[in-house]
Swiss-Prot record:
Compartments, record wording: Nucleus
Main location: nucleus
Record text on cofactor binding: Binds 1 Fe(2+) ion per subunit.
Keyword Metal-binding carried by entry: yes
Residues the record lists as binding substrate: 144, 175-177, 233
Species whose genome carries this gene: Mus musculus (Mouse)
Residues that, per the record, bind Fe cation: 231, 233, 287
Cofactor list: Fe(2+)
Entry GO terms, CC: endoplasmic reticulum; euchromatin; mitochondrion; nucleoplasm
Pfam families reported for this sequence: 2OG-FeII_Oxy_2 (PF13532)
Protein name according to UniProt: Nucleic acid dioxygenase ALKBH1
EC number: 1.14.11.-, 1.14.11.51, 4.2.99.18, 1.14.11.33
Any GO BP annotation: regulation of translational elongation
Length: 389
């Protein structure tokens, strides 16, 4: 039996063992996996999907997904740093209707804009982040400047204190997700970033979701030892609209399961620039990130991030130049990190939030102890993820 077949057989046996649900077993397996070994033999790599001649044994068939090429003009795609839709490659998985995977459709250098936005702009007030629980507004407002000095230091040692950016775990945009109640509300809203909204609208439209409105975003900031627990994104009031996911930085393993946790998940790589869309049947499936993978060559950037932004950008471009100084900070951070943006439409068109009784005591939505992005270095003990979440 070859190493690939042996790895798949081992996973099938593991998932079938009693006492623990299949998803949890495979989550634990991949969390402890060794990059570069047969441990990752059953992980789908969509960046190589066009080269695959036959599916891996025991792994769902990868199929091409037809995009709506004429729905997004080349000019609108270029405005947000995307290739023309005609050049994108989009895939689905048999058994997962509504799941769409688009391997890096960004123009050379344009990922840098979105990385800078996540680290420098979106992390600022009035947006909400995990640091708000323990710091004043003035302290978190200086997140970028403080981190810039620390990350640009040539003396990078294990003893140096972590920058605020390295302590950042999540940021919420638009309608701010309440980690305690697992709800959104009309009275906790700040304007959604216009550039990210336009990017999301173009991707959604190309995938057949005309009229998508970006109303809420959750940005997760992963270190190499971070994981994202098993969960379902069900808090939005309109599940007919897709959930969009954008990844930048180091690669990660993503697990896509079923409606119940006793269904074994499918594993896939998420590389820098990759976009995932969860819609239809796949919109409410269990999913998780058990592992962020270190670069095989050490603390290096993915190759696609080595290319600088073009010297001249279109006059109407939403992609902005990134200074050498700013990119130095971003690059230092991303050598051992990953950033993920998820964008959602919360309400159906014309829908309002339901009226609810006013609670006497309002609990703090910025409590980082309630975030399901697990950081083993955090001094705050996180609550166990509700199995029904």
């Amino acid at each position: 039996m070859g190493k690939m077949a042996a790895a798949v057989a081992s996973l099938a046996t593991l998932a079938a063992e009693p006492r623990e649900d299949a998803f949890r077993k495979l989550f634990r397996f991949y969390r402890q996996s060794r990059p570069g070994t047969a441990d990752l033999g059953a992980v789908i790599d969509f960046s190589e999907a066009h080269l695959a001649r036959s599916p891996k044994p025991g792994v769902p068939q990868v199929v091409r997904f037809p995009l709506n090429v004429s729905s997004v003009t080349e000019r609108d795609a270029e405005r947000v740093g995307l290739e023309p839709v005609s050049k994108w490659r989009a895939y689905g998985l048999e058994g997962y209707p509504g799941f769409i995977f688009i391997p890096n459709p960004f123009l050379p250098g344009c990922q840098r804009h979105w990385v800078k936005q996540c680290l420098k702009l979106y992390s600022q007030k009035p947006n909400v982040c995990n640091l708000d629980k323990h710091m004043t507004k003035e302290e978190t407002q200086g997140l970028w400047e403080q981190s810039k000095e620390v990350l640009r230091s040539k003396e990078v040692t294990k003893r140096r204190p972590r920058s605020l950016l390295e302590r950042l775990r999540w940021v919420t945009l638009g309608y701010h997700y309440n980690w305690d109640s697992k709800k959104y509300s009309a009275d906790h809203y700040t304007p959604f970033p216009s550039d990210l909204a336009f990017l999301s609208e173009q991707v959604a439209t190309a995938c057949g979701f005309q009229g998508f409105q970006a109303e809420a975003g959750i940005l997760n900031y992963y270190r190499l030892d971070s994981t994202l627990g098993i969960h379902v994104d069900r808090s939005e009031l309109d599940h007919s609209k897709p959930l969009l996911s954008f990844s930048f930085g180091q690669s990660a393993i993503f697990l896509l399961g079923g409606l119940k946790r006793d269904e074994a998940p499918t594993a896939m790589f998420m590389h820098s620039g990759d976009i995932m869309v969860m819609s239809g049947f796949s919109r409410l499936l269990n999913h998780a990130v058990p592992r962020v993978l270190p670069h095989p060559d050490g603390e290096c950037l993915p190759h696609c991030l080595e290319t600088p932004l073009p010297a001249v950008l279109p006059s109407n471009s939403l992609v902005e130049p990134c200074s050498v100084e700013d990119w130095q900070v971003c690059a230092t951070y991303l050598r051992t990190a990953r950033v993920n943006m998820t964008v959602r439409q919360v309400l159906a068109t014309g829908q309002d939030f339901p009226l609810e009784p006013v609670e006497e005591t309002k609990r703090d939505i910025a409590a980082d102890g309630l975030c399901h992005l697990h950081d083993p270095n955090s001094p705050v003990k996180r609550k166990r993820l509700n199995p029904n979440s």
